Amino acid sequence: MASGTTIQPSRPSLTSNDSAVLQALFDAESSPSSAVAIDPSLSPFPEYLHISASDHESLKARELSIIRSLQSDDVSMDTITSAIRDLDALITEHPTYPSAYVNRAQALRLHIEKTAEASTDPEEAIFTPGNTESASRLFSDLGQAISLCTPRSPADPVSTVQARILADSHTHRGYLLLKAARLKKNANGNEMVGGPDKLRDMGPDQLEEMASRDFFFGGRYGNKVAQQLAVQTNPYAKMCGAIVKEALRKEVEGVI
């Protein structure tokens, strides 16, 4: 009687370089460039913004007095509108103060979601035609905050204040880009009729790549959620993942 033979599926062999590439693609924290030097001893903002530490304290106090009014669970439209006007004035007086742009973007988003029709998902209200102007302002504010806070050289360290603003702004913008990408996909290629003007003519894949880039930078500056979203939206990670899955499938099928 013949003895039974068990066929063991072979395990795909990866070189150390292959493993390193896969790790870098799928692990948001594995790459040496995935983090930046955050120096708590630095002044809140770089010198070229002309905001001293004492200026920052007074601006922060004024800003906090504005945004505290928005902390209520059922904040009124009048309160939101008033806060946006106050932030407008603050930005007009101090156009290089990045944090005010971040908070005005938040206030604009709150205003948009508050005015959403009952039949509209509040998180999708920003992409309705009636909110195009506000959505464009919101997107512009996030871009301005990022532009002001981004170090002139990638090797330059950033302050804890800079890092927080960059993490928040990149993550917020990445979320909006990802939302726009998914809405475009659901529209089956039809043009998005609302949302920020800059995004109107972009395709879903381009929007998702931009979102991935923003999540990458949000993660670099310390946002843990952005780190994970950067991996999930990374087109190269997706492509590599598909290749690996296909190779594994063929490897298994070849020995059965």
From Swiss-Prot:
Q: According to the lineage, what is the superkingdom?
A: Eukaryota
Q: Which family does it belong to?
A: Belongs to the TTC36 family.
PANTHER family registered for this protein in UniProt:
CDNA SEQUENCE BC021608 (PTHR21405), TETRATRICOPEPTIDE REPEAT PROTEIN 36 (PTHR21405:SF0)
Explain what induces or represses this protein's expression.
Answer: Expression is induced by L-tyrosine. Expression is positively regulated by the cluster-specific transcription factor hmgR.
Any Gene Ontology CC annotation: cytoplasm
Where in or outside the cell is it found? Cytoplasm
Q: What happens when the gene is disrupted?
A: Impairs growth on L-tyrosine as the sole carbon source and affects homogentisic acid and pyomelanin formation.
Q: What is this protein called?
A: L-tyrosine degradation gene cluster protein hmgX
Which processes are annotated in GO (biological process)? melanin biosynthetic process from tyrosine; tyrosine catabolic process; tyrosine metabolic process
**Keywords assigned by UniProt, alphabetized:** Cytoplasm
Q: What does this protein do?
A: Part of the L-tyrosine degradation gene cluster that mediates the biosynthesis of the brownish pigment pyomelanin as an alternative melanin. The 4-hydroxyphenylpyruvate dioxygenase hppD catalyzes the conversion of 4-hydroxyphenylpyruvate to homogentisic acid (HGA). The protein hmgX is crucial for this conversion and thus, probably functions as an accessory factor to mediate specific activity of hppD. The homogentisate 1,2-dioxygenase hmgA is then involved in the cleavage of the aromatic ring of HGA and its conversion to 4-maleylacetoacetate.
The record's InterPro entries line, in alphabetical order, gives:
TTC36 (IPR038906)
